[in-house]
Swiss-Prot record:
PROSITE patterns referenced in this protein's UniProt entry, alphabetically: SPASE_II
Membrane topology designation: Multi-pass membrane protein
Pathway: Protein modification; lipoprotein biosynthesis (signal peptide cleavage)
Any one of the GO CC terms: plasma membrane
Keywords, in A-Z order: Aspartyl protease, Cell inner membrane, Cell membrane, Hydrolase, Membrane, Protease, Transmembrane, Transmembrane helix
UniProt catalytic activity: Release of signal peptides from bacterial membrane prolipoproteins. Hydrolyzes -Xaa-Yaa-Zaa-|-(S,diacylglyceryl)Cys-, in which Xaa is hydrophobic (preferably Leu), and Yaa (Ala or Ser) and Zaa (Gly or Ala) have small, neutral side chains
Pfam families: Peptidase_A8
Gene: lspA
Name listed for the protein in its UniProt record: Lipoprotein signal peptidase
PANTHER family named among the record's database cross-references: LIPOPROTEIN SIGNAL PEPTIDASE
Length: 163
């Protein structure tokens, strides 16, 4: 009996797993080698500064009394399920789409794990120009941003089949 080989993008989920592993390893190292709020200069424009974020991007809702942790964890989980389903319906040959979805899934689940384990997300990457600092972020956040960028580029460059 010959089995039909799947042409769907399921194998790209391994890339999501890699993103999760890199994210969790980098956060483990940040927690063990950095001190909260004490920057370590890496480059003239880059510090590693340990920060715990109970909110979302740019610490949105970070000062609330705790409900936001459950809220953002639930959003991460639901979005990840939706994106996994989307990836399951994507052709393996759509590399940019598959890679973008995989990056977003990995990033969302990396931060989801932090919220479940610690009730906050560990951030440590601190880009700055002199005294101006961008919001501190992590590997998962980077994966999400790159993934969204790839999806946008894919959607702009792929001709629509609709009239």
């Amino acid at each position: 009996m010959v089995t039909k080989k799947s042409k769907k993008a399921w194998p790209w989920l391994w890339f999501s797993v890699l993103v999760i592993l890199l994210d969790q390893l980098s956060k483990y190292l940040a927690n063990h080698f950095l001190s909260l709020g004490h920057p370590v200069k890496i480059l003239p424009f880059l510090n590693f500064t340990l920060n715990y974020n109970t909110g979302a991007a740019f610490s949105f809702l970070g000062t609330e009394n705790g409900w936001q942790i459950i809220f953002f964890a639930a959003i991460s989980f639901v979005v990840s399920i939706f994106l996994i389903l989307w990836l399951s319906r994507t052709s393996r040959s759509e590399i940019m789409m598959s890679l973008g979805l995989s990056l977003i899934i990995g990033g969302a689940l990396g931060n989801f794990i932090d919220r479940l384990r610690w009730s906050y997300v560990t951030d440590f990457i601190d880009f700055h120009i002199k005294d101006w600092h961008f919001a501190t972020f992590n590997v998962a956040d980077s994966a999400i941003c790159v993934g969204v960028f790839l999806l946008i580029v894919h959607m702009l460059l792929t001709p629509s089949s609709k009239p």
